[in-house]
């Protein structure tokens, strides 16, 4: 399994992500061709090698012709929708922009549609977000990990005046993400960097064993007593079986409108749950009820607890910490009469399993107006024939 690990020892920002990923050796011209699919003008990109505390990295400078362009969320979503980028990149970009909009709206006590994007709406940030997601798509990795994030400290001057570090919007975006303070001063994590990394990565305190193939360094703009760099490892997981730490959240509910459970389930998945399921149970005094079970990464525990307490009638939630073992897996593409279809392939000690991606099968069924079961059945025959599963 091909993985990336973001080693954020000096924090993270949008331009640092671009620099580190380009430093891994991604084809620059191919990346620029993908950027041309974004319907925006008035910028140029300068890429150079720079030194931070005697460590060389890639610096990305996005130069904007008009520095007074401000946009709202709907403007950013329109740019994404009108681009010719893949649906996966578009969906991820929308997640990032929504995160920042929701954080800014909460801090400034307004709605997400009324937020005036002084930073986020700036063209350089649009390129930071979409450019980073394009690079990740080009790298074709199966899993992305990140270290906990250093918050920095002190104060910085912003368009609204002097604000504490981390910036309020940044800290709002980082809810549920492992962070730490170590006495360093300065803004180490930007809102854009926080939104991108919290969307794409799983945060781990201990990196699973990997064979490192490449290392990339992306330069930050400020100079600190320490190297202001983002380091990214590209490599292969060594273990056939992957171990993860998860939390299982459970609560019994017998006094809530059942219509709410559908909305609750969707919201829990949106906030980072790995699985959510409902089990009919009989409770005390013979009352029928529902056992809500949520499985999630440890980093998402507090955010999901907030959703459960906010959206249900429960007064308490049980927490069970578990180890999960996962078969090594990768995403491949196979040719079918309907075009390319992604399949998930897992393998351990000669045991091989492969399944077609549901969303690809669903799209074919809707486009061709044929039963979903026929699409899945046909693709499973191809998998069995070509992969000998």
Curated annotation (Swiss-Prot):
Organism domain of life: Bacteria
Name of one Pfam family that matches: Ni_insertion
Matching InterPro entries: Ni_insertion
Keyword Lyase included in the entry's annotation: no
GO molecular-function term, one example from the UniProt record: lyase activity
Keyword presence, Chloroplast: no
Keyword terms, alphabetized: Nickel
Family statement: Belongs to the LarC family.
Protein name from the UniProt record: Putative nickel insertion protein
Organism for this UniProt entry: Dictyoglomus turgidum (strain DSM 6724 / Z-1310)
Taxonomy of the source species: Bacteria, Pseudomonadati, Dictyoglomota, Dictyoglomia, Dictyoglomales
